């Protein structure tokens, strides 16, 4: 299928046919501050999600790259100042050197915060994975992306979705020739529930570990078109090495 039909997930839903936006369809409003590692990437507006992995580092999708980013932590309703937020500018934004904008392979970047986040009950880091994602494992996906599979409705409050990791065979069958070893699928082959525009870069967490980053898909919540996610396990060494080199 022509790559121009891919709806990838960067949140500025300008009318580009190759649009990197991503959303939660068929989910529910997260309990307030129940996803303390979730961040909003802001450049005057929310455009992507991300995950806090240490006091001073955030991981997101490579396609979410912008030269200037403010990281917003402790958010629930992104349109209201609720008193728990921390707004910290990015000091460094480091995209994976082998990121491919055409195939979205190596769709990962790191953000160093200009000052460490204050860790508390509303803002805390998520652990990196110690094993690759296993088929059938329940996962939590979260974000402020579009909640409609057709049309647009961007929520103010953080949305959550519980969904299973699919087998690599199911993933590859859904997108023949498009799935690399650095990608995996999460969701429901029958459709109806998925991430979508605006969720890009956000977390997929299983058993308390960050297994995935919202990356791409064909449409949102479509039958036999599950969401595709960056396999964080493959990048643990790169993450650790990059942090060490930029401390």
From Swiss-Prot:
GO terms for molecular function: calcium ion binding; metalloendopeptidase activity; serine-type endopeptidase activity; serine-type peptidase activity. Expressed in Paneth cells, at the base of small intestinal crypts. Residues 1-15 form the signal peptide. The record marks 194 as: Required for specificity. The modification Sulfotyrosine is found at residue 154. Ca(2+) binds at residues 75, 77, 80, 85. It holds the Pfam family Trypsin. Residues 16-23 form a propeptide. Sulfated on tyrosine. Disulfide bonds join 30-160, 48-64, 171-185, 196-220. The active site is at 63 (charge relay system), 107 (charge relay system), 200 (charge relay system). Its main location: secreted. It catalyses: Preferential cleavage: Arg-|-Xaa, Lys-|-Xaa. It comes from the Eukaryota. Changing residue 153 to H: Abolishes tyrosine sulfation. Residues 24-244 form the Peptidase S1 domain. GO terms for cellular component: azurophil granule lumen; extracellular matrix; extracellular region; extracellular space. In the ileum, may be involved in defensin processing, including DEFA5. This is Trypsin-2. It comes from Homo sapiens (Human). The lineage of its organism: Eukaryota, Metazoa, Chordata, Craniata, Vertebrata.
